[in-house]
């Protein structure tokens, strides 16, 4: 491949050269949402992070099979295998079938992802559609001796596994630390050890979501689905497993244990994790009740928001930080992102207004190289954006007459902005920006301003001023140029 991509491997705690197991094919699995409520900003971050990785790997010429699961069963209220299934609880409270809840919120999740310009994955498997595969996984772990049946449930034997392997190698924990921080909970007596986790849970009589198994009616533990579905669609060994850093422990740690216990080694080569979205330094999440949904951002309807923010503003806001750095929500930060995005999109639009010269005194090749170098450095999107802002300055200087650019360089500059702004970062021009009026009024405004140019040429200053004043009153900003005019609709 032309470019040498390095990515930070959480397992080894360092950046490593990305070398696919079966180039040019790449297998990538990312933990998707548990669909029992509307998607919030915390859901947008992993979706956008791994969308950029998907886009970039594709741009580098790899054939990527991107699997992002949907958790629609087995995710209990608490990680210690106690409490009610989150979706079943929502269904009970709303007096709906669990799959009605799943379908409703999944439709809304897809709509939000489409608004954010997140590409759909290659495969989007549901946990409830892979019960057979999860039962087979549990059988293999039982046969290997790393699990036990207890009162109709099956638990992973962490202590026994830890004698042969290292439980905690991903999160950097040892078993004593895990035991010291694991609470003894009521109803946990069937476990040998508080740190043991459920592979299969016995369904209580009132439990709606249940399937027959060799151990009786029940449902799979949360961790089983990703191991089973990753193996089914990507094989026993694949390249990348991603998710939020809050999944490192226990979810991804348990996935590694399940994989090793069932096949003798870890399925995953590179473990990647994005950092969290915070509000006043605290993780944003449904379980904490401090989240703002994406629809609330788009409409400005949450009490913490001073205005509405477009989907591309949200995307740009997230990409302005490196994916492994925390992002703290504030209206000020979002407004700054909105202005930055506007500057970038104006630069893209201005490219069409440039008349090439015979010679060039700008270095487009260097700009392109710097952008690729930043992406190859563990997807350093904030550095890419800073280079694109340098490109925007270049464009403004050319338009102002301070620099010149040849036709070939102009073509290359357009390609750089299109490749990085749209193809890789996944930004797009929003027809809905400024309430959609700019796109709707474009031809009319151009026609009026052309009449104004004619009026000025005829020294009809009254008509010229009337057109300008009326458009200004409607929110249009008019700028006279040597080639005629420019305009934009202010927010």
UniProtKB/Swiss-Prot annotation:
GO terms for molecular function: ATP binding; cysteine-tRNA ligase activity; zinc ion binding. It is an enzyme of class 6 (ligase). Its main location: cytoplasm. A motif ('HIGH' region) lies at residues 33-43. Zn(2+) binds at residues 31, 226, 251, 255. Keywords: Aminoacyl-tRNA synthetase, ATP-binding, Cytoplasm, Ligase, Metal-binding, Nucleotide-binding, Protein biosynthesis, Zinc. A motif ('KMSKS' region) lies at residues 283-287. SMART domains: DALR_2. Its EC number is 6.1.1.16. It catalyses: tRNA(Cys) + L-cysteine + ATP = L-cysteinyl-tRNA(Cys) + AMP + diphosphate. GO terms for biological process: cysteinyl-tRNA aminoacylation. Binds 1 zinc ion per subunit. This is Cysteine--tRNA ligase. It comes from Bacteroides fragilis (strain ATCC 25285 / DSM 2151 / CCUG 4856 / JCM 11019 / LMG 10263 / NCTC 9343 / Onslow / VPI 2553 / EN-2). The lineage of its organism: Bacteria, Pseudomonadati, Bacteroidota, Bacteroidia, Bacteroidales. The gene is cysS.
């Amino acid at each position: 491949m032309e470019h040498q991509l390095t990515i930070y491997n959480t397992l080894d705690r360092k950046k490593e050269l990305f070398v696919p197991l079966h180039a040019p094919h790449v297998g990538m699995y990312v933990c998707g949402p548990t669909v029992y409520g509307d998607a919030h900003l915390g859901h947008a971050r992993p979706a956008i992070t791994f969308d950029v990785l998907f886009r970039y790997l594709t741009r580098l010429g790899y054939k990527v099979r991107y699997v992002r699961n949907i958790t629609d069963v087995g995710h209990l209220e608490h990680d210690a295998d106690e409490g009610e299934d989150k979706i079943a609880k929502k269904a009970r409270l709303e007096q709906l079938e669990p799959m009605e809840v799943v379908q409703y919120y999944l439709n809304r999740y897809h709509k939000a992802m489409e608004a954010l310009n997140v590409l759909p994955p290659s495969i989007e498997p549901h946990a409830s559609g892979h019960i057979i595969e999860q039962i087979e996984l549990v059988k293999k772990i039982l046969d290997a001796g790393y699990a036990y049946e207890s009162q109709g449930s099956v638990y992973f034997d962490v202590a026994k596994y830890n004698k042969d392997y290292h439980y905690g190698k991903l999160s950097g924990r040892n078993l004593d630390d895990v035991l010291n921080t694991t609470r003894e909970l009521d109803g946990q007596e069937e476990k040998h050890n508080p740190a043991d986790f459920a592979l299969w849970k016995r369904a209580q009589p009132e439990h709606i979501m249940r399937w027959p198994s060799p151990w009786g009616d029940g449902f799979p533990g949360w961790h089983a689905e990703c191991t089973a579905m990753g193996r089914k669609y990507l094989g026993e060994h694949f390249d990348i497993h991603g998710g939020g850093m809050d999944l490192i422990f226990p979810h991804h740690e348990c996935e590694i244990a399940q994989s090793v216990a069932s096949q003798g080694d870890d399925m995953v080569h590179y473990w990647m994790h994005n950092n969290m979205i915070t509000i006043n330094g605290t993780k944003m999440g449904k379980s904490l009740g401090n989240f703002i949904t994406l629809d609330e951002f788009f409409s400005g309807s949450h009490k913490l928001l001073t205005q509405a923010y477009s989907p591309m503003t949200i995307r740009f806001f997230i990409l302005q930080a490196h994916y492994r750095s925390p992002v703290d929500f504030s209206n000020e930060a979002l407004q700054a992102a909105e202005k930055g995005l506007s500057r970038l999109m104006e630069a893209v639009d201005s490219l069409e207004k440039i008349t090439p010269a015979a010679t060039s005194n700008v270095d487009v090749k260097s700009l392109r190289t710097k952008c690729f170098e930043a992406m190859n450095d563990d997807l350093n999107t904030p550095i890419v954006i800073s280079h694109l802002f340098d490109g925007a300055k270049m464009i403004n200087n050319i338009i102002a007459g301070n620099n010149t650019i040849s036709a070939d360089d102009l073509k290359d500059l357009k390609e750089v902005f299109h490749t990085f702004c749209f193809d890789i970062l996944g930004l797009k021009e929003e027809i809905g920006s400024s309430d959609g009026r700019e796109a709707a009024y474009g031809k009319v405004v151009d026609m009026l301003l052309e009449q104004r140019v004619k009026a000025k040429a005829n020294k009809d200053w009254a008509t010229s001023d009337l057109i300008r004043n009326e458009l200004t009153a409607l929110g249009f900003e008019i700028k006279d140029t040597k080639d005629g005019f420019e305009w934009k609709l202010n927010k």
